[in-house]
Regions:
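P-loop NTP-binding core
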Residues: 1-203
Length: 203
């Protein structure tokens, strides 16, 4: 399929009135029952546009526009999954506002823990500010190089801290992940038998 020339500003900064206006952003794929709204380098500059628009709007809840726009098409899909950068920005805030549930991967390091605590604060603030009911649904460990002492310690620590919200399946490091990204192919079709693919299936 031809890649659409997407005006992300319309999606993030304008309240669409018709479902058809939002569906124009969606592209079909070669994979059954999977459609995609592709990302772009343009998103890196959109954060400034969102900031400027929020100031121009005089307090209008522009962070909720993506949520509104996706709500127009939610009945057309079983799930809408937002794969988002952990970097805290206006885009991240819009994505969190648009979500009903948040699941986040964490690496075996203290930076992931610090980011997780910041995410909890953000969810709590947005729920309070906009009367939302965003649920933190769970975490899982990723990019696991091996069952090292540090990994075991952090696994046990997260398990004790989060209970049922800590998903007990860890995604192991696997060269096939990088290779599939390079070829723009889903991991499950690139190498379904690799360790990471099996871990994701179990997850």
């Amino acid at each position: 399929d031809e890649v659409l020339d997407i005006n992300y500003e319309h999606l993030f900064c304008t309240k669409q009135l018709r479902k058809s206006s939002v569906l124009e952003f969606i592209s079909s794929t070669d994979y059954k029952n999977i459609s995609i709204l592709s990302a772009s380098r343009e998103l890196s500059t959109l954060v400034y546009t969102i900031y400027d628009r929020s100031k121009e709007a005089g307090g209008t809840n522009i962070e909720l526009y993506l949520r509104h726009n996706l709500s127009l098409i939610k009945d057309d899909f079983d799930y809408i999954i937002i794969d988002n950068s952990p970097f805290k920005s206006y885009l991240t805030t819009c994505a969190i506002c648009a979500s009903d549930k948040i699941v986040t991967p964490i690496c075996v390091d203290n930076f992931s823990y610090d980011g997780l605590m910041s995410l909890f604060d953000t969810i709590e603030d947005l729920n309070s500010k906009y009367s939302l009911a965003i649920e933190f649904a769970g975490i899982f460990m990723t990019r696991v190089a091996g069952r090292t002492t540090l990994y075991k310690q952090m696994f046990e620590s997260y398990e004790n801290m989060f209970g049922e919200k800590f998903l007990p399946v860890s995604i192991r490091n696997c060269i096939a992940v990088s290779e599939s990204n390079t070829t723009f192919e889903p991991l499950l079709t690139y190498d379904k038998r690799c360790t990471a693919a099996q871990d994701y299936i179990e997850l």
